[in-house]
Amino acid sequence: MSKICKLIEAENPMMRVRLSGCSSDLDRNDVEEKLFDSMKHYNGIGLSANQIGIMERVFVMYSDVKKRETITCFNPKIVTQSDTKILMDEGCLTYPGLWLKVKRPDGIEVEYEDKNGEIQNQAMFGLECRIFLHEYDHMEGTNFTQKVSKIKLNRALKRRSKMVKRSKLVENQ
């Protein structure tokens, strides 16, 4: 049975809270299933628990987008990160239709617990690294709109607004 959860709106104060560690009585299998089903339903490549109203330090992501392989990261930590940064487009399920060029490290070493509580250590690069950092930010109470200047954000919001207006015109024809 599918466990799709509704996405929390960007303005919701829950999206600005830094999440502490996972509760000791957390049903990790249930949370993982809700995250994965919701991420798939909304066509995402990553999803943090607070984006669906679960205030626990956990997210799910595709570790290999092409192969559709996923990992679930409970209590994740960034151990080290590359000094080299790369500028790439990013979107977010919390901000549908908004794309921003965000500069992030091109490589990181991370540590997280899997659903069985086992510690996993992993090096990540490229898109996998970007997804991890994006979802990690959600748990820190920040998001990708805070990674760009106000001018760039306002331009992107105007572009998104124009796209929404155009799509409504097409729907009404």
Please give the residue ranges for each predicted region.
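Positively charged
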Residues: 1-173
